Structure formats: structure tokens, C-alpha cells
């Protein structure tokens, strides 16, 4: 199956979509097909993982599971391609080519490339909508180059793989906050994505029981400009969604501010004792956009 002609892929000069999945993306091991539908139902998009979530000896079985559910029903029914992402193994590994061969026989055209490190690597995924996962030192340093690839629709960063690639032991300090290098990498990926007009996806929160910590990190992701956040457990989805859905008070305040701006008819004006200009109005517009999407 030609990726450019398959379901979910556009054709012509502008064949690559704008990434709109989210805000809660849920990983699901590809070798657990009985979980596919549940993961899809509980999230905004499911990530079928052929990489880290699958043991080397089970990768062949995982690819077979993806193919086997096509056209089937029940708990292993075929997933909606517009809400499905497949994470493939890194370019240059034996499993990468096998993953592509599998994908060519499916309708799934949004791919997450594990350990993306250069823009050149993205040529191997021409015709696919790619989320480039920057999770090595090289990938972070080259994030801006990677984001410029035409088929890249978004960047995500991976904290634990990044630290491991540098010989470290943990991305977080004892208080739960990120170490400086992780914070720098998170910001680097966010800026690279937004500068290229692509979406940015925040890394997973690995402390599954700590929903309060996840809520705080998700709120920061929203405020910073990340368009989505990845999850590793269904219980995390509601927390991420709540963070991205503005409160009724925030929506009302944003509407009032934009109405006041329209009435003022000037570039800069005072509103409730504060000076308001273009960037502040964009914040209000972003709040209303998130309200419509939630």
C-alpha cells in the first residue's frame, strides 16, 4: 500500500496534515491487541508501541497483532486511523524496516519515530505524518533541524531515554522536579517545534500513582504551549484532559477581554488596571480554542 494513497494521507503539494490529536495520547504495547480498543476509548489518540514497550523477542508478534486486527471486530476491532499513532523502532535498526513493511499494509499513516536524531532520517518516512521523538543528546541538539522536515507534524521529547543516552541515572531530582538538563531539553524541543509551525508533545509522567504531580506538570505544559501530553496509564488521561480544558471562569474572562479589545479599537489598552496588548489577546484566543476542543 502506497503511504501517499492510503487512508489518512493527503495528496498533492500539501500532503502533510496539521497534527490535531490530543491532548491526551495513550501508549499501548503493540503486542497486547486485547488492549487496543480500551486504550483508544479512554484517550484522545492511542499510540501502538512497537519500540520500548515490546521485548525484542516479541516484536514480530507485535507487528502481526497490528495486521491481525485489521477488519476484525470486538475488543480487537480495527482502530480509527485519524486517532491512531504507531511508534516505530529507530532508523537504522533491523526492526525499523520490518515496522515499515507492516505499516504499508495498514491504514495507519501517523508514525512516531523513536530516537529521531537528524532531519535526514525523516526521508525514510516520506508519505507518513511523523511525530519525531527527540530522546537522545543528538536528537535534542538537532531538534530544530528535525522539525523542519516536511513530513514532521510534531516533536515530542523523552526524558528517561535522554538521560540514559548521556550515562545519567534519573531525569528528576529528589523533589520530583526535572534536572536542569531535562528542563533545557524540554524547552529546546518546544521552541524547535513552534518555530517550525509544528506541534509539541510533552513527555510522559512515569510516577503513575502521583496524579497531583501529573496535574501540576500538565498545567505547566498547557501554560508553556505544548499541544498534547503523552500518557502511560489510562488513569492519567482524565488528569491531562482536565489540565487542557480551561475553567468556565477562564473562558468567561477570555471572552470579556476580547470583547473589551474590540470595543477599545486600539493596539494597546488598559483592562482592569492592567496594560493589554497583542500577546495577551493571543493568550485569550488560545484559551477559547482549548475550550472548543475540550
Regions found by a protein language model. Give the residues of each.
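N-terminal amphipathic/basic-hydrophobic helices that include classical n-h-c signal peptides
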Residues: 1-16
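Expand to "…catalyze enediolate/carbanion chemistry for C-C bond making/breaking, isomerization
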Residues: 13-294
Amino acid at each position: 500500500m502506497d503511504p501517499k494513497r492510503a487512508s489518512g494521507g493527503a495528496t498533492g503539494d500539501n500532503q502533510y496534515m496539521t497534527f490535531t490529536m490530543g491532548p491526551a495520547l495513550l501508549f499501548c504495547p503493540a503486542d497486547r491487541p486485547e488492549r487496543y480498543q480500551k486504550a483508544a476509548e479512554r484517550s484522545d489518540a492511542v499510540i501502538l508501541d512497537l519500540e520500548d514497550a515490546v521485548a525484542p523477542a516479541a516484536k514480530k508478534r507485535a507487528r502481526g497483532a497490528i495486521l491481525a486486527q485489521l477488519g476484525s471486530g470486538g475488543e480487537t476491532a480495527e482502530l480509527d486511523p485519524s486517532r491512531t499513532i504507531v511508534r516505530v523502532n529507530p532508523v537504522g535498526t533491523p526492526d525499523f524496516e520490518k515496522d515499515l513493511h507492516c505499516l504499508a499494509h495498514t491504514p495507519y499513516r501517523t508514525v512516531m519515530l523513536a530516537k529521531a536524531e537528524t532531519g535526514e532520517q525523516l526521508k525514510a518516512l516520506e508519505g507518513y505524518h511523523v511525530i519525531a521523538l527527540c530522546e537522545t543528546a543528538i536528537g535534542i541538539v538537532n531538534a530544530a533541524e528535525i522539525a523542519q522536515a516536511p513530513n514532521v507534524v510534531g516533536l515530542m521529547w523523552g526524558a528517561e531515554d535522554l538521560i540514559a543516552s548521556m550515562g545519567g541515572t534519573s531525569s528528576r531530582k529528589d523533589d520530583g522536579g526535572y534536572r536542569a538538563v531535562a528542563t533545557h531539553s524540554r524547552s529546546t524541543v518546544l521552541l524547535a517545534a513552534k518555530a517550525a509551525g509544528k506541534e509539541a508533545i510533552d513527555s510522559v509522567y512515569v510516577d503513575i500513582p502521583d496524579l497531583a504531580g501529573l496535574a501540576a506538570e500538565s498545567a505547566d505544559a498547557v501554560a508553556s504551549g505544548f499541544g498534547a501530553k503523552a500518557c502511560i496509564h489510562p488513569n492519567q488521561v482524565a488528569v491531562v484532559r482536565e489540565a487542557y480544558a480551561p475553567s468556565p471562569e477562564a473562558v468567561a474572562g477570555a471572552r470579556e477581554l476580547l470583547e473589551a479589545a474590540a470595543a477599545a479599537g486600539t493596539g494597546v489598552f488598559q483592562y482592569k488596571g492592567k496594560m493589554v496588548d497583542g500577546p495577551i489577546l493571543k493568550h485569550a484566543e488560545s484559551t477559547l480554542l482549548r475550550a472548543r476542543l475540550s
